[in-house]
């Protein structure tokens, strides 16, 4: 059987660039090489695309704090539409190896916000993960919360700040509505980039300024007292949920360094030590949230479980990490689906959805 060529797109012009490199390394290592050939498509921090050498594409590959994309002499351009060669050498216009399906693992801005997905749709390339709308909606925490709330799902109370209204809403008003502590977040960032915990007006001002360094819109959330539970969802029209896992923190909250740099910052417990009926309740809510946002392929749904066993949805991540400590693959391993089989299934789901999309009528 002829192997499929899988283009793994990674890196990106994002605050989560290094996280993406870690995820790509693990996917390359785990992919079923008897079924798939890998084409590495690395994006540097300036947004330039490169074809990378699979044997030597990372610097400091085993050091999360210093991992980097190795410079490549071959930069590429993409040719939209149905062509024999979708990728060409940007320097000389010569065709580059074709790909059958794209596995995007570009976390954060321009990677999981619908931008990359839109480009791949225009190129008529199958790709792993959610489509444009779901990707954009889940990336924007303000939009996510509004859609979940309208669907009757439980979310933390919040206020949205923009550059236009931020000075019209005082700290006293925010505290009166949401109480303390607060969490201040850029609306369109992941991996806790630019997130602060706030317990005073002085901290609030600093936190809002920091969040606006990363986005034009900022979310201020009520702090929820509860356990941090995560659930993995997999599928297109009939998604399935994994068993649940828990993030047990040794720090104040799940910050970027806690997730990816400090090995002692948090403990990942899979499966979570919760009652079976609570596990099933969270799994059902995760699937409902996934379908509400129109997700496909995969997503990780993060919730808080309060002492009263109330489930409060925190966020939905449509391109969850595949790093050594990432919860998404661990949850499926605990549910009986190994790392290699998970990657294979994600590729299959991408091809299935692409075939269904191409079967739709485009003319009257």
From Swiss-Prot:
UniProt domain ATP-grasp: residue ranges: 145-348
EC number(s) on file: 6.3.2.4
GO molecular function, one term: metal ion binding
Compartmental location: Cytoplasm
Note on how the cofactor is bound: Binds 2 magnesium or manganese ions per subunit.
Chain positions recorded as ATP binding sites: 175-230
Example GO biological process: cell wall organization
Pfam families with a match to the protein in the record: Dala_Dala_lig_C, Dala_Dala_lig_N
Catalytic activity: 2 D-alanine + ATP = D-alanyl-D-alanine + ADP + phosphate + H(+)
Keyword terms of this UniProt record: ATP-binding, Cell shape, Cell wall biogenesis/degradation, Cytoplasm, Ligase, Magnesium, Manganese, Metal-binding, Nucleotide-binding, Peptidoglycan synthesis
Top EC class for this record: ligase
Pathway(s): Cell wall biogenesis; peptidoglycan biosynthesis
Chief site of localization: cytoplasm
Residues the entry annotates as binding Mg(2+) 2: 315, 317
GO-annotated cellular components: cytosol
Cofactor field: Mg(2+); Mn(2+)
List of residues binding Mg(2+) 1: 302, 315
Family membership: Belongs to the D-alanine--D-alanine ligase family.
Function according to Swiss-Prot or TrEMBL: Cell wall formation.
Name this protein carries in UniProt: D-alanine--D-alanine ligase A
